[in-house]
């Protein structure tokens, strides 16, 4: 925690966090679209997207050379080119734990920062002989010749003026990210979004919902036990119990490009979705994006869903990114 934040009255920290929550709350009931170009960003804006996330044009090329996990943060030039073309908010992605990268994104005037778990995260290694934590770019367990567990660093988000979006595979991760200052939680990516299995997204949403139900139905003793298990404050668990949901917007992410899947995720309690770039592989991306917005707004209307299934050509998958 920075010296400035330690000296800051708690009311000011809370006021700044409330402002960030106001921004991310505006995304509820809408879609955020990942894009590879300004042209795709314009199409997303026209379809009603709440925001866009530019990602690297050379991402797939670099993965072919260096293998999975070689993703880089998006170049600021690509972000600026999207900002010049659209009026909706633009979200910048940074490596998990990379504070300076996040500061650079904030200076670039992005609306939000997505602390992404798959773009070469910064990790820490505990060296027992020296009683120190060593930070290094994503590396294998057992580095430095010691048997240890490597863990990912996370950015402490409260000092930032822009809101953060963070991924979570379960409720424990979601609550930790919120305690760090995240203003929107999405489901985590198990692999790159282009190859992520949509069933894993459904599984994570169900898992988080089941854990929330456990909190809602638990007594104070159970809450204290869960607070210790999750390593979060009891006050945060009480907020979840009172609201019967996460205290921040909750989005589904990972291989989302089929409107009928979006309808299912919304029916499960998601506040919105982050759409994969795979949507632009559809024969008519504009129609597909419009259908996703329809699925978000009318997920409980079977007549509307029948129409979007017909336009999508059934339930089956679209061609792969290389097809």
Give each language-model segment a name.
Residues 2-323:
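Alpha/beta enzyme core
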């Amino acid at each position: 925690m920075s010296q400035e934040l330690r000296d800051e009255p708690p009311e000011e920290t809370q006021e700044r966090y409330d402002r960030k929550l106001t921004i991310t709350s505006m995304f509820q009931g809408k879609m955020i679209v990942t894009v590879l170009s300004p042209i795709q960003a314009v199409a997303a804006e026209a379809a009603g997207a709440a925001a866009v996330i530019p990602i690297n044009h050379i991402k797939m090329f670099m993965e072919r050379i260096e293998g999975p996990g070689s993703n880089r943060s998006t170049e600021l030039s690509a972000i600026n080119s999207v900002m010049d073309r659209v009026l909706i908010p633009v979200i910048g992605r940074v490596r998990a734990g990379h504070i300076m990268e996040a500061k650079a994104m904030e200076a670039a005037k992005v609306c939000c920062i997505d602390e992404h778990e798959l773009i070469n995260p910064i990790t820490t290694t505990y060296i027992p002989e020296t009683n120190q934590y060593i930070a290094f770019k994503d590396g294998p367990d057992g580095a430095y010749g010691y048997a240890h567990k490597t863990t990912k660093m996370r950015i402490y988000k409260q000092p930032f003026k822009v809101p953060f979006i963070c991924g979570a595979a379960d409720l424990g991760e979601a609550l930790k990210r919120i305690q760090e200052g995240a203003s929107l939680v999405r489901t985590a990516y198990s692999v790159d979004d282009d190859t992520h299995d949509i069933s894993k997204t459904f599984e994570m949403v169900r898992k988080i919902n089941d854990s929330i139900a456990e909190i809602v139905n638990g007594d104070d003793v159970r809450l204290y036990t869960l607070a210790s298990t999750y390593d979060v404050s009891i006050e945060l668990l009480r907020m979840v119990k009172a609201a019967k949901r996460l205290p921040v917007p909750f989005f589904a992410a990972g291989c989302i490009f089929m409107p009928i899947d979006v309808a299912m995720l919304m029916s499960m309690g998601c506040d919105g979705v982050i759409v994969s770039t795979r949507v632009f592989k559809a024969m008519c991306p504009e129609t597909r994006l419009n259908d996703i917005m329809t699925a978000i707004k009318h997920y409980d209307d079977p007549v509307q869903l029948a129409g979007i299934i017909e336009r999508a050509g059934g339930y089956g998958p679209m061609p792969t990114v290389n097809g």
